[in-house]
Amino acid sequence: MCSLFLPGTHSRVIILQTMILFVGAGLGLAAPTEFRFDFGSGVQPRPGFVKVTPQQPYDASKGYGFLQSDTVPPVGILTNSNIAVAAVTPARATTGISTFAVDVPEGNYDVSIVFGNPTEPTSTTIKAESRRVMLQKVETKPGQFVTNSFTVNVRRPNLRGGGTIGLRNKDGQSEGSSLDWDDHLTLEFNGSHPGVDSLTVTPSTNAITLFIAGDSTVCDQPLEPWSGWGMILPSFFSQGVAVANHAQSGLALFSFEQQRRLKKILEEMHPGDYLFIQFGHNDQKDKSPGAGPYTSYKDNLKKYITAVREKGGIPVLVTSMERRNGKNWKDGKPEPTLADFATAARQVGEEEKVPVIDLNEMSVKFYTALGNEGSVKAFVHYPANTFPGQDKPLADDTHFNSYGAYELARCVAEGIKSKVPELAKKLLPDTGTFDPAHPDAPDSVQIPASLSVGANVKPAGS
């Protein structure tokens, strides 16, 4: 069994693979304040820090505590979540992963984390909300402590005029109880040898918010092994940019608006914020009279653009990546399935003077570089019994695993550099350059899996 804590003499204890949830009521947060946590046992916390022991379960009256650890079984909101521990077998439940909760309201937050261990090397990946990657592979040497910071968005489904967005319920899963829409900011501490020394959370009032509207290929997928590029994109930005990924599986431009998701974005948008728009997979299935890439699709894109500009925001179009289309390759690349929608988006970009990130074109280069057989490594293609409860093979040519999502996020980051130069200034210096015709090797991308596994729950859309 992995211990929750790494041994050491440093006054603040190191947490192993910890998922931290910030829940929304108990600390009386009518006005946001700074929260500082020091995880220790048998020692006094630093001045101004809250001491929490690993044996302390979440207590709503206190507003913080563990929802799950090696000594605290799953309780309360974690059990009721749609990623709840049904997939956590007894063998996986002793990994040292734990969940910690503390109250915060909706908004953007700057998160500062001190990494390190007095006697051992550490390697930590940070995820937020539904597996949103914030920091990748932060490494320290024995006795070394480093501080990394990022800005994260926390949202609620409530609309200002009353009511909520149109939350979905599918296969027994309630979107309203997902980590994207509940009362929590979720931070998952993962990696080969995680080491977190302390944590500070501060409301961020001046951050740029990068909103995303899209479908299952973009969204923060709550369950392994499914991934969207929008859940990887935050890891490429420096503190001061919060990615608010409102994309949802199964949606098209018209249904995203019908479910009041665009309205929610516009309510939260401030001048200078961005909305990245990627649809096409599900718009293609619209059989209503007059529907099509050069009619309703273009009209809906223009409607979004107008609404964003009225709020002082900056719209950016992203053409839909191609499906792998594994049974239909010609001349070494997949036959196109979304070419008309990509062309229509490019036309709208030119007509409306809106930046267009051509992910469709870049994705074809990416798949072609891997080859027909090799490209399965970017998608959810796995033999039976790869994941808990998965008794049948998975062969999905639409939805991506973490490697595929990571490579597409790199494509989007490259598109930002060429098409959205002001936002590109906020990319991390080590983002580097990326050519999809020369992608990273699949084995070189190591994003540790979360415990929230749902291999038998395919996202809506195709």
Language-model region placement:
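Bacterial N-terminal signal peptides
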Residues: 13-26
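Short, flexible loop segments at the rims of nucleotide/cofactor-binding pockets, characterized by
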Residues: 90, 251-256, 333-334
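Short, structured coil segments at secondary-structure junctions
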Residues: 128-130, 237-239, 311, 352
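Conserved SGNH/GDSL esterase-like catalytic core that processes O-acyl groups on lipids
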Residues: 180-182, 190-196, 202-212, 217-307, ...
